[in-house]
Amino acid sequence: MNYQVLLYYKYMTIDDPEQFAQDHLAFCKAHHLKGRILVSTEGINGTLSGTKEETEQYMAHMHADERFKDMVFKIDEAEGHAFKKMHVRPRKEIVALDLEDDVDPRHTTGQYLSPVEFRKALEDDDTVIIDARNDYEFDLGHFRGAIRPNITRFRDLPDWIKENKALFADKKVVTYCTGGIRCEKFSGWLLKEGFEDVAQLHGGIATYGKDPETKGEYWDGKMYVFDDRISVDINQVEKTIIGKDWFDGKPCERYINCANPECNKQILVSEENETKYLGACSYECAKHERNRYVQANNISDNEWQQRLTNFDDLHQHA
């Protein structure tokens, strides 16, 4: 495989995010890179793809900058680009938690746990493990015994914690996310909320899966990623599928977006059921006049109406 996907972040000061974004986009395009990078006054958060040569040049370029000289890159091999375009966007935050009283992870953040230390925490009955990702990420794969917050956006996590505080009272709390960036800020927020014993998986699931000692042990399913790959394997010890098809509940790890552009809900669904239910999550979405599956597959009105009858006897799970 001649391509690589890079995942990285760093909390540090960028004085002029707008100018930085403009210059950085030009550099990335000149090196034929594709991906998504967010920059703000609090730092940088990026994931991009390119050939090995181009991504190595990018990392060398970043490490040559005093501000990014110690930035850690998580690297996956790939068969081609994981993105279709290149975006570098200035933002208020590099992860959107939208707190009234913001947290600076450079000053307030949970204790860092190495993959081996995190594995011990997973084995400790007195430790609560919180998945800091969204529900659809959790449903594709997660650490065994982890708590699933019922959220679809990271910014909703603090409210969910407040509503369920009894679950974590007087417990050691350990949190994890994809690459570590969300936990840097979330664990700091937990400390400010009065939780005393707070830790985080340093480098996230991506680092844990590549660790030569842990080898992704205790991870079930796949890890959701925000690029064209959709998911990657983590557990090198044993393979399990925990995802369930939206319609029939059978084991499934195939995510699609609902074909109704006004819904766009992410659902796990087999190719067979995608065809059967017109790429939609519900009858209402399947019959939507702008159904993308119907348009992309040139389905006739008669065939459309015929397939809609597949919903008649369907009892969807929640």
Curated annotation (Swiss-Prot):
Q: One MF term from GO for this chain? A: oxidoreductase activity, acting on paired donors, with incorporation or reduction of molecular oxygen
Q: Which Pfam families match?
A: Rhodanese, Rhodanese_C, UPF0176_N
State the InterPro entries in the record.
Rhodanese-like_dom (IPR001763), Rhodanese-like_dom_sf (IPR036873), Rhodanese_C (IPR022111), TrhO (IPR020936), TRHO_N (IPR040503)
Which SMART domains does the record match to this protein?
Answer: RHOD
| Active site feature | C177 (cysteine persulfide intermediate)
What is catalysed by this protein?
uridine(34) in tRNA + AH2 + O2 = 5-hydroxyuridine(34) in tRNA + A + H2O
Q: Does the keyword Oxidoreductase apply?
A: yes
**Rhodanese domain ranges (all copies):** 123-217
Q: What is its EC number?
A: 1.14.-.-
Family annotation (CDD domains): RHOD_YceA (cd01518)
Disulphide bond pairs? none
Q: Which GO terms describe its biological process?
A: tRNA modification
Keywords from UniProt, A to Z, are: Oxidoreductase, tRNA processing
Top-rank taxon: Bacteria
| Top EC group | oxidoreductase
Q: Does the keyword Membrane apply?
A: no
Function field: Catalyzes oxygen-dependent 5-hydroxyuridine (ho5U) modification at position 34 in tRNAs.
Q: Which HAMAP family match?
A: TrhO (MF_00469)
Family the UniProt entry places it in: Belongs to the TrhO family.
| Name of the protein in its database record | tRNA uridine(34) hydroxylase
Native species of this protein?
Staphylococcus aureus (strain NCTC 8325 / PS 47)
What taxonomic ancestry is recorded? Bacteria, Bacillati, Bacillota, Bacilli, Bacillales
